[in-house]
Amino acid sequence: MSTLNTILIDFKLTPGWGLARTLARATGEEWIIEQRQTNQFHGSPVANVWRMMWYFLFPLQVVLRRKRYRRIVAWQQFFGLNFAFWCRLLHLRKVSDLTVLTFIYKRKPGFLGNLYHRYMTYCVNSPYVDRIVCYSREERELYAAAFGTRPERFVHLQLGIAPIERPNCDDRGYIFASGRSNRNYDFLLDVLRGTTHKCVIACDNYTPRHPYDNVTVLHDCFDEQMIDMMAHCRCVAIPLKDATVSSGQLVILQAMSLGKPVICSDVAGIKDYVEPGTAVMIPNDVAAWRDALLRLFTDEAFARQIAGQGHELFLSRFSEQAMHERIARVVANSCCYGR
């Protein structure tokens, strides 16, 4: 039986990323990292086609060498789901324990939405998938119902990120919002209409229905540039659309790491990441958001308190290493398949 294991990632690997080392300590086995950077393919129909293509082709490459691996951890959910897709489609013998991370799903309307749901159900219920990690407690029951499977198939773990080091995080007086998944930027613009607050939105697939003098939308702001924009904002806004969809956790942790106050929609997926006094969490009510933003801009003590308590919470519970250790405990306790 092989004791070689692999992690499938879709981002540019940094030297300090320690999941492989943490998994090696927990399992007593060798771990390697296989990378296919797909998070760069955004912003145009052609880029989206390339990204989708690699979501299927890279897992197929892994399938061809699957007998090398005792355990597979898919950081990019579609790398893991499509590994299971190919194995099920080709009726291959199961030889690897598969953990799928960073899972998120929202049902879409219409013919394509139904087709996507059938594809996701086929993958999620595949016998080649051993567990799927989601980042809020409520999702386990929601996803189990959506895909007609048992809740135990889904494992809840809290997200974590590496601390963001920025020596200069001066406040330049604008609201910053970023992210694609489940965002309700139209609501945020309704909040800002008629106010003097300036706002910068970093999102490659959002265009306002009408121009706003106080709102700038950046379609090509990613990675370090996005973090730089966040580092100089007054506060970070996370307006979310569907209360049942897990989203916004990464941005809230980035803001807390930088010591920026957060205002966000009151949704279930965020509640696992905040405590009283660490963020302004309110329903999507225009008047309530306007009042909260006004206070964040005019009450310095309040803004500093929210930012400071959020930063302390991040350091104590949401570091990247803490997340890696949570993943390692789940994977190390898994049943593995011989051949």
Regions found by a protein language model. Give the residues of each.
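A short, well-ordered alpha-helix in the C-terminal region of glycosyltransferases
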Residues: R295, F302-R317, M323-R329
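Donor nucleotide-sugar binding/catalytic pocket of nucleotide-sugar-dependent glycosyltransferases
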Residues: V129-A144, T149-E165
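Short acidic/histidine- and often glycine-rich active-site loop of Leloir-type glycosyltransferases
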Residues: H210-P211, V267-M281
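Conserved catalytic-core segment of nucleotide-activated headgroup transferases in glycan assembly
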Residues: D170-D213, V217-E224
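Short hydrophobic beta-strand element within catalytic cores of glycosyltransferases
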Residues: S257, P261-C264, M281
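Conserved acidic donor-binding segment of nucleotide-sugar-dependent glycosyltransferases
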Residues: P276-A287, L294-A301, S316
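Acidic donor-binding loop of glycosyltransferase active sites
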Residues: M230-S247, K260-P261
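Membrane-proximal helix-turn-helix segments that form the acceptor-binding/catalytic region
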Residues: L60-R68, L92, F111-I132
